[in-house]
């Protein structure tokens, strides 16, 4: 998936080690971010629970991004502003590693890691 990105910007949503907390100590998200940076991707981060002046809001994080990468299961990520995401991205792609998103509107590609929602 990463090799097919249109440009080198990835919007990372969530760096806390656990959903709905502000604790990012020893979070695996930082290892993922470091790997992506090493591979020359530009990274923008939005985490509404972690205080860091470098972290931006959803609008700035997704502006001109090629991928939204959800790494934490904060409640805020369950109902994102999909219109804003579509407006900010040339091709809106979301990769949800926490399986917190069930559906997205038309015009957004959603990839869930191990999605079990379709099983009834």
Segments predicted by a language model, with ranges:
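Structural/interface elements that position substrates and couple domains in central-metabolism enzymes
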Residues: 1-120
């Amino acid at each position: 998936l990463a090799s097919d990105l249109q440009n080198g910007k990835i919007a990372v949503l969530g760096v806390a080690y656990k959903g709905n907390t502000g604790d990012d100590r020893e979070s695996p998200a930082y290892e993922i971010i470091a790997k992506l940076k090493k591979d020359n991707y530009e990274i923008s981060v939005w985490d509404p629970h972690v205080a860091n002046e470098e972290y931006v809001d959803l609008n700035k994080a997704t502006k001109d991004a090629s991928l939204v990468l959800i790494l934490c299961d904060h409640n805020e990520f369950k109902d994102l502003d999909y219109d804003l995401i579509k407006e900010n991205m040339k091709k809106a792609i979301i990769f949800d590693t926490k399986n917190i998103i069930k559906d997205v509107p038309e015009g957004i590609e959603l990839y869930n890691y191990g999605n079990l929602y379709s099983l009834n």
